[in-house]
Amino acid sequence: MPNYFFVKLNPPRPTFPGDMTDEERDVMQAHGAYWTEMTRKGFVIVFGPVLEPNSTFGMGVFEAESEERVWELLADDPAKKAGLSHEVHPMRIGAVRGSI
């Protein structure tokens, strides 16, 4: 069975992305393009923003052989290069659509 990892992109401040600067907007566009490419390559199952009442954060689910591989892939994320931080959490999957 494949290994799955929940990845959270921590926002730089609680008001983000509502008050993004032009530079941050450029970074986030590049970030979205990077995650789209990771999805095309089969590493990412799903990704996008989570809209919390007091904050918004990014999330994605990776399929990879190890947590170390996820961190290697995240090193090239433009958001990471711009100084934003990620959290990586291993997941235990109850079921995946299409596999049951």
Predicted feature residues:
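Conserved, structured core segments of small domains
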Residues: M1-I100
